[in-house]
């Protein structure tokens, strides 16, 4: 693998830009015609458990609700797009974004950025895909150009605003997306050929893209043809990788990148052969001889090779690695970096805190992804005795294993394990018809694990029971039931809470059936009701 050093030139950051750069946006502008948020009544059963000052969105296809703690800031309409705006590297979500239809706007859409009080911060005359990097608000083109590429990029499709000063920074006229790293700005530009008519599909789009790296004043520091720049936050398991690293994809022909390079905007170090991020500040890189290196990108200023493997690395916890093993009788390889032990793995699962490894010899281990500590080490059953199996890292040291006997996939054996071994072999609820077809982890709290259990209800509608770790149904007949996914774990619901719909209400519920916050399915601000169909 080639490692090169590239030193970026720097210019003193400009603290003040021309007012003309602010065309189309302003700090604390006059109220827009949208007149948001719409006043709504807070349900009387809103729980004090939500009074934590965190922004959350209760999604509904006909109008989503934005809350800060238990206070309702905004009730949306069906034509709106609502999203949280945050920096994954920070510990708070400070803003939310609303875009809506407006025929008076040249684009047919307007949008605005709001803070945690519901105050309007900035307004725009079109919709954008919005990200936050430190104090920089990045407005990218809403529609992913890669999936349309039938029109030219217009000036203003990609913008960068310093929220500290309210100043808009220079951006290339043909830029459609930007990645911010250490006060440097990597723009991806699309130079559409003039020979193509508007609406004509560009089959060679990636032959016409260009990466431009600029400082705050717009001075170009580096340019690369047939190259795109993206943030590692678009990859999986990026916890712990500094924002110093940006991903550069290079294209020679077609839509698949021919090479991928991680570039460090602070040190100038570049690492070729990027494969994927692996968690805990590491990533996998393919070398020129076909090997794969696990490289630590976070512990020191320069990268450090931790180990080399003959397969691509999928997951990493300190002292433990899981590699892909395509083409053999088993799917994965487990490597103990301390003892050198290697064993075939049938299935594996990870969340942001734990890594569950189910080996073909029947051993099941759960690792802490931060410390590498073994939370659970038990024997389940050899894969040779099963037709197939699934494993989940449930949380709080739990691991869930579903074993499917040969010839009968209708009733798998469901086992829950913790550090002491088997907690319970879960039985199908007696109240559930034989139409059972879905079982998955739901939430954990206070040392207890809960699962959602789907089955066919009346008129073919799917209903859900909530089961505890002992297999007891603590809630029955929910119309919807699933985990809440918010802003990268920054605004998780209070422990144990999840998304649910029961009767004519939908919202956030606890395992004892209490609503933390709920809304009536008839509370939509439009004439058409989504009846709580959450998206």
What are the roles of these predicted feature ranges?
Residues 33-535:
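Residue-level detector of conserved, function-critical positions
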Residues 7, 31-32:
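Intrinsically disordered, low-complexity regions enriched in serine, threonine, proline
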Residues 27:
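Short, conserved catalytic or interaction motifs in soluble domains
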Residues 2-13:
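Bacterial N-terminal signal peptides that target proteins for export
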Residues 14-16, 169:
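N-terminal processing/targeting junctions
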Residues 23-24:
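C-terminal motif of bacterial Sec signal peptides marking the signal peptidase cleavage site
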């Amino acid at each position: 693998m080639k490692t090169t050093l590239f030193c970026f030139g720097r210019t003193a950051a400009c603290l003040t830009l021309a007012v003309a750069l602010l065309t189309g946006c302003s700090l604390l502008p006059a109220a827009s015609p949208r007149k948001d948020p719409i006043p709504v009544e807070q349900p009387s059963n809103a729980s004090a458990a939500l009074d934590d000052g965190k922004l959350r969105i209760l999604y509904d296809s006909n109008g989503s609700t934005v809350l800060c703690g238990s206070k309702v800031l905004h009730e949306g309409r069906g034509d709106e797009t609502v999203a949280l705006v945050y920096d994954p590297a920070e510990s708070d979500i400070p803003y939310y974004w609303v875009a809506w239809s407006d025929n008076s706007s040249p684009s047919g859409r307007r949008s605005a950025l709001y803070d945690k009080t519901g105050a309007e911060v900035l307004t725009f005359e079109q919709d954008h895909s919005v990200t936050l990097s430190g104090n920089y608000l990045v407005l990218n083109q809403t529609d992913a150009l890669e999936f349309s590429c039938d029109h030219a990029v217009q000036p203003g499709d990609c913008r960068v605003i310093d929220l500290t000063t309210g100043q808009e920074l220079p951006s290339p006229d043909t830029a459609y997306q930007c990645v911010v790293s250490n006060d440097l700005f990597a723009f991806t530009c699309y130079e559409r050929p003039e020979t193509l008519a508007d609406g004509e599909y560009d089959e060679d789009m990636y032959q016409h893209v260009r990466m431009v790296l600029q400082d705050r004043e717009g001075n170009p520091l580096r340019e690369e043809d047939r190259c795109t720049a993206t943030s590692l936050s678009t990859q999986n398991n990026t916890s712990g990788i500094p924002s110093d690293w940006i991903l550069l994809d290079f294209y020679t022909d077609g839509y698949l990148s021919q090479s991928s390079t991680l570039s460090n905007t602070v040190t100038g170090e570049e690492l070729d052969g990027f494969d994927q991020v692996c968690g805990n500040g590491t990533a996998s890189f393919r070398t020129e001889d076909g090997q794969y290196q696990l490289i630590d990108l976070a512990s020191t200023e320069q990268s450090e090779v931790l180990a080399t493997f003959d397969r691509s690395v999928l997951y990493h916890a300190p002292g433990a690695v899981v590699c892909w093993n395509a083409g053999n009788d088993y799917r994965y390889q487990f490597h103990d970096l301390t003892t050198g032990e290697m064993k075939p793995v049938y299935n594996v699962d990870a969340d942001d805190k734990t890594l569950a490894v189910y080996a073909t010899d029947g051993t099941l281990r759960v690792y802490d992804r931060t410390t590498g500590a073994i939370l659970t080490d038990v024997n389940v059953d050899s894969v040779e005795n099963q037709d197939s199996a699934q494993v989940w890292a449930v949380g709080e040291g739990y691991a869930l294993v579903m074993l499917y006997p040969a010839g009968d996939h209708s009733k798998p054996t469901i086992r829950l394990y913790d550090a002491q071994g088997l907690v319970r072999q879960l039985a199908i609820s007696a109240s559930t018809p034989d139409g059972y077809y879905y079982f998955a982890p739901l939430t954990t709290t206070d040392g207890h694990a809960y699962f959602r259990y789907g089955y066919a209800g009346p008129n073919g509608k799917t209903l859900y029971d909530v089961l505890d770790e002992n297999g007891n149904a603590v809630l029955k007949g929910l119309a919807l039931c699933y985990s809440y996914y918010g802003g990268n774990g920054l605004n998780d619901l209070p422990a144990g809470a999840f998304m649910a719909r029961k009767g004519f209400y939908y919202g956030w519920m606890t395992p004892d059936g209490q609503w933390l916050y709920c809304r009536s399915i008839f509370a939509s601000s439009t004439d058409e009701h989504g009846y709580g169909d959450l998206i």
